[in-house]
Each structure stands twice: as structure tokens, then as C-alpha cells.
UniProtKB/Swiss-Prot annotation:
Subcellular location: Cytoplasm
Species lineage: Bacteria, Bacillati, Mycoplasmatota, Mollicutes, Mycoplasmataceae
Binding-site residues for ATP, renumbered to this chain: H19, D167, M168, K169, R233, F234, D242, R248, K249, A265, K269
Protein name per its UniProtKB record: S-adenosylmethionine synthase
Gene: metK
Cofactor remark: Binds 2 divalent ions per subunit.
Amino acid sequence: MNQNIEKRLFTSESVSEGHPDKICDQISDAILDEVLKQDKNAKVACEVFTTTNYLLIGGQISSTAIVDYEQVARDVLKKIGYVDDAYGINANTCKIDIKIESQSPDIAQGVELSNDQIGAGDQGIMFGYATNESKTYLPLAITIAHELVYNATSQRKKGLFKWARPDMKSQVTIDYTNINNPKIDTILMSIQHDPNYNEIEFKKYIKENIMDLVAKEFNLNTDFKVLINPTGRFVIGGPQGDTGLTGRKIIADTYGGYSRHGGGAFSGKDSTKVDRSAAYMCRYVAKNLVAAGLADKIEIQVSYAIGISQPISIFIETFNTHKVDLNTIYKAVYENFDFSVSSMIKTLDLKKPIFFKTSKYGHFGKKDLSWEKLDKIEVLKEYKKCS
């Protein structure tokens, strides 16, 4: 490591939709969406556990919706490509247990308040972040890491990526030594494969048709260090290789460790759970502030108490990149954004069944998500004039 002692290297990781934890996230959000299609006011907290050819679906769901949870789970597995016992779980043969109950009435009385107000479903802290270092206003490392496993999965599903199986991970190290010209230092990919495969051809395909392809998409270098399946073999994968659980990839789901995280997971939770809705709102606000030019980087923290609709606190960090006085940024936030639970749900249209698409390859950076819209730029630019 001596040769890198003066380098500024930052690393983030992502996982494919076939990773055991992501299987669980997708099933949790697929169930949430199916419930919301029938009952937009449903209260959902759904979690999934998986191991070799087995799923356990549990949680609390209060709703008038009638949903075949088992069928939803099997459909998700089929979409991923888990239709072979050798892969670690098989949509057609796996055992599924259902342990779903109704929401606690003690929680319900704190959520449903008068005058159309909604109390926070729990206490907690949430963060949102944006940076102008990429077109999606996300850090480069996590953005590239997502694209690698997304691209590899797409090629596998199309039959182009020979020998590949569903379970994959990526890890990207960005060299920020020249802060104005970041480059890729290292890419690591671990990709499950068939037992009878040509290792040299497999790795060559990954470097040329996945790693290099993605690097070029971002107009970045292709002379990075390469690590592919460092143990030498990755046949046993999926839930057979590791157990999976909803909510265990919260850093890959957000900013790849580049920003702080409050600890609350997203998948399987309806929008009255501020772990999800407030984190989305913080991202929405931070992204619009950065896009409006008020700072190069912004991180927003909020906190809530169960049963109370308004946040307990709001904190804004710009990492000394603000272009206007920090008090002006606070003023812009307080005058243009409402962090009450009911307002966040309305602003971001969070009663719609939109959550399955967030359950893989990150909850941020996708254009068609409401919290990614840039509809406050012009009004926020006005604050640059009065600073």
C-alpha cells in the first residue's frame, strides 16, 4: 500500500438483484406494491428471510387488500432467474412460510391523527444527500457500482453472458487525488457461475464487455486494476451461499457510504414509515439545492418522534461547498419544503405502487422517481440573489 499512501481513494459496493439480501428486498417491495394497488392507505411493514430453497415472509400488514403473498414471491424469483435448484433457490420448488399479522393498535393510534395529519410511524433519524460530481447528483463510486451489476445482469438475462448465474457483487474504488479529475482506481466483481466454465474466457468477457463498457459510459479510464472472483471460484451462491434478509443493504441502497445513514431500511415499508419517506424527501431537497447551485454537496438530516407529524430537527451540511450563506440555505428549505409526514407523502406521491423499482440497483438516481424530480430549481436560484 506504500505506493498509494498519498492517493485519496474512496470505495462503494453494489449487489445484483440475485443477491440473497436483494431477493428479500424485492419480495418485500413487490408485496407492498400489490397491497397498495388495492388499498392506497394500507399500513405495511413486510420483511423476508431466505436460505437454501426457503423463504419466510413476515411482518405487519393492515389492509383491505387480498394478496397471494406466496405467488408474489415466486414471481419475483422467476423474474430474477431463480428457476434451477443448483442456483440456491428455485421459484418452482422452494418452501415458503407466511407469518403476517396486523399492525399494533398502539402504533396505529399515533399514525392516524386528526385534520388529515399523519404522525410518524416511529422515531428515528434520516439523511439525504446530493453532489454535482455526476449527472445523477450521486457519488461516482456507487453510481458505477450499480451500473456494473445492472449491466452484467441484463447481459445474463439476454443470454449474452455465458456461464453467469444471478448472484453478483461489484465494488468500485475512485481515485480523488486530483479532485477535479477523478478516475477509476480498481473494480472488483464477484459473479456466480456454472461449475463447468472457461475461467479465462469468463474473466475476459467481464473486463471487456462489462467493466470497460461501463467505464466508457462515464467517460472514465479503462486502465484500472481488476479483481474478478478473487477466491477463484463462485459456484455456490444465492441463498445457499448466504442467508438473505430484507434491509441489509442500506448503504448500497443509498450513497455507498459517501454520506451518513440513519440506520433505517426502506424496503417493505409504506410511506407512513419515515425511515423511507423522510429519506426520500431529504434526497429530493438536497438534489434541488445542489442543482440550483446553492452548494456543490449537501447532506440533510431530519429526526422524528413516533406519533408527531413534524420533524423534531433539521440539519444541513454543505462540507464548505456552499455558494451562499448557510442561513440562506436554511431559509430556502424552510420556505419551500414541508417535512410533515402527510406533506411528504403528497409531495412525492408515495401512496402509489412505485416501490418495487427501488428495491434493486439503488433507491436514488432513477429519473422516473418522484424524489428525483428537479422542479424547485428556479425558485431556489432566487436565494442566490439575496445572499
